[in-house]
Amino acid sequence: MTNDFHHITVLLHETIDMLDIKPDGIYVDATLGGAGHSECLLSKLGKEGHLYCFDQDQKAIDNAKIRLQQYVKTGQVSFIKDNFRHLKSRLADEGIYEIDGICYDLGVSSPQLDERERGFSYKKDAPLDMRMNQDAQLTAFDVVNTYDYRDLVRLFFKYGEDKFSKQIARKIESARKEKLIETTAELAEIIKSAKPAKELKKKGHPAKQIFQAIRIEVNDELGAAEESLTQALDLLALNGRIAVITFHSLEDRLTKQLFKEVTTLDVPKGLPFVPENLQPKFSLVNRKPILPNARELSENNRAHSAKLRVIQKIRN
């Protein structure tokens, strides 16, 4: 693996074990990233099995081709440079209309966070960017400097869940009248200045939630996740599974709600029996999310907020 794309995979074995891999199955890693999940999954596939890997970051794909070269040589893995919201159409391009399993590791990958010039981190000064796909148009700079006060407040409340959203939006509006806000450090300082002193003493960086909100907006992360998960449910073969790792409450809420909708019986009360065609087609594999164990938490700080949810198709 190349040294500049180091990534510790979260909930690695739990995720792949929960997919219940069939050696000759067709699988998808919707979020290739550092290729940890892909490598583990491929090790369980036979010669007839195949894995399709999605990522919109060319660096991630280039790295994965090196890390997974033994499977590239045997033709067991394919790479698709695209947003996973195009899951169904891009798999159709490959002649795939049904899959046995798919895994998602949502959010931004560690290498993207660590690469200063990508502008994801409030800890490293860099131009405001935050694009997972470097070919995309909208950047964090655009959001911070062109969104009006109301849109910023809506964004910070909805995606950042920050109770000081109004104060922060006002500070941004005021600061950019003097000069454009160009770097992550500038933005982080403006956010800090908008919060009361007692708030700054609390654990965690004061800019964390706002940076998350801007990142979600720039990449339409929740919209893409909902579209992709809905398509994944349609693509699943009988007994196929979807495994989703989330890192914040917004992603987890979306996943939990979507899974609940397709696993809950929706019939009139008082019905003496439920016909087969009205029974849910899906079932939760784990009622409660799977969390990292103590060892993983001690080795990987990023794992602290991780949750794994898994669903299975039980009827056609």
UniProtKB/Swiss-Prot annotation:
Keywords annotated in UniProt = Cytoplasm, Methyltransferase, rRNA processing, S-adenosyl-L-methionine, Transferase
Asked if Methyltransferase is a keyword of the record, the answer is yes
The record's InterPro entries line, in alphabetical order, gives: RsmH, SAM-dep_MeTrfase_MraW_recog, SAM-dependent_MTases_sf
Q: Where does S-adenosyl-L-methionine bind?
A: A35, G36, H37, D55, F84, D105, Q112
Q: What class of enzyme is it?
A: transferase
Supply one GO BP term: rRNA base methylation
GO molecular-function annotation terms?
A: rRNA (cytosine-N4-)-methyltransferase activity
Q: Which Cys-Cys disulphide bridges does the record give?
A: none
Catalysed reactions, as listed in the record: cytidine(1402) in 16S rRNA + S-adenosyl-L-methionine = N(4)-methylcytidine(1402) in 16S rRNA + S-adenosyl-L-homocysteine + H(+)
Q: Would I find Cytoplasm among this entry's keywords?
A: yes
State the GO CC annotations. Answer: cytoplasm
What EC number(s) does its UniProt record assign? 2.1.1.199
Protein location? Cytoplasm
| UniProt family annotation | Belongs to the methyltransferase superfamily. RsmH family.
Q: Can you say what this protein is called? A: Ribosomal RNA small subunit methyltransferase H
